[in-house]
Amino acid sequence: MEESMRKYYLAIDIGASSGRHVVGWREDGEIKAKEVYRFPNGVQEQDGHLIWDIDALLSHVKAGIAAARTEFSSIISLSIDTWGVDYVLLRGEVHVLPVYAYRDSRTEAVIPQVYSILPFSELYRRTGIQFQPFNTIYQLYADKLAGRLEGVTDFLMLPEYLLWRLCGIKAKEYTNATTTGLVSAKSGEFDAEIISRLGLPPMFPKLQKPGALLGEYEGIQCVLCATHDTASAVEGIPMEENAPYISSGTWSLLGVKTPKPLTDAASQATNYSNEGGVDYNRYQKNIMGMWLVNRLKDELCPQMPFPEIVKLAEDSGFDETVDANAPEFLSPVSMKAAFDAALDRKPQSVGDYFRCAYRSLAFSYGEALAELEANTGSRYDRLYIVGGGAKNDFLNQLTARVTGKQIIALPIEATALGNLKIQMEADQ
């Protein structure tokens, strides 16, 4: 196809540490992509809480769109994906500040109160969502107890909020909504019983599926992709067969596609989650991921390139491990101190800390994969790894050794590719 006739699409993929704008097009039957804009992201501390600068995110979204149009004049559509669970409250057309980040500790005190109304066993049976202290259900109940829901007329998950600010159309997208812990595993819609018993306001309409068209932003069609980044990432993995995957970033999401949710006792006991996919269920588990490594780097050797860090880890003889999913690693003041406190024998060098982190991640992958196979009754030969962590050969080797699987490491922007794929299919 001549370049002048080519259709271009824009994926805006925002992670907890950075965001990127990626323009994609079809060429020779494949999706080609080019990153045109990248920006930093991160939580900020305000009044003892962790928050997102939502206005800065919107500014970067618009700046990246302008950068994309400078290079690619005929962009057909755009879509936005981010991490799950976080949201913006609205009073009419005005957003309520602050926009809390999932690593904030405000939910800790309210979780027992939620369980006094809805025991976790009932919540899991109804929603199939694994326990995480930051799930939207606990955040919204914390808002209720703090009086933040007074006068609130709506809430939008972060990507849907940003899309609304671009095109003026509000929507609640299915894959991201499933991360709230408020969606019925049976119906695929918000669970009215849960919402009623928690006394939440009437702001839970019918959900929309990936591919739905919204309004326009400066002549560009806004589309709902799978706005939860992991759901888009799974769409972007070029699997030859259905096999387990790890979407490896700040979090490592390990899972497999299943026809329907699994909400049995074994799934609950092993803390597996059932999240929305594009016409399938994602049976998966959140694992702490590169958060451990990145925080250690920030603290121990902020200027050291990752290849040097990996070499130090490879050369270290330190073989102790920690529970990578332990709550003390979620948001510690010092990641080094958190490792020290969790280990009987303390690391003696920078390489020791990173070797411990990488080995701990590999063992957590192995444990989670064994649980997945037991719970689904299926055995797999391959494990696909995408995202930033797929570039780490040392971690891939450790994972292969622990799991006994053939590792298919694809250092691709799977999330952006999935986002683009959904837009292209919506344009058919």
What residue spans do the PLM features occupy?
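Short beta-strand scaffold segments in enzyme catalytic cores
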Residues: G19-G24, D86-L90, G181, S232-G236, ...
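A charged, well-structured terminal subsegment
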Residues: N135-Y141
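Glycine-rich phosphate-binding loops at beta-strand->alpha-helix junctions
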Residues: S18, K209-G215, Y380-L398
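Active-site core segments that coordinate phosphate-bearing ligands/cofactors
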Residues: L10-A11, Y115-T127, Y141-T153, M157, ...
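N-terminal glycine/serine-rich phosphate-binding loop of ATP-dependent small-molecule kinases
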Residues: M1-L97, R125, G151, S196, ...
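Short alpha-helix plus adjacent loop in nuclease-associated cores
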Residues: D104-I117
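Short beta-strand-loop/turn "lid" adjacent to the catalytic site in phosphate-handling enzymes
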Residues: A66, T70-Y102, T127-F134, L163-S184, ...
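Short glycine-rich phosphate-binding loop at a beta-alpha junction
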Residues: S74-T82, N375-G387
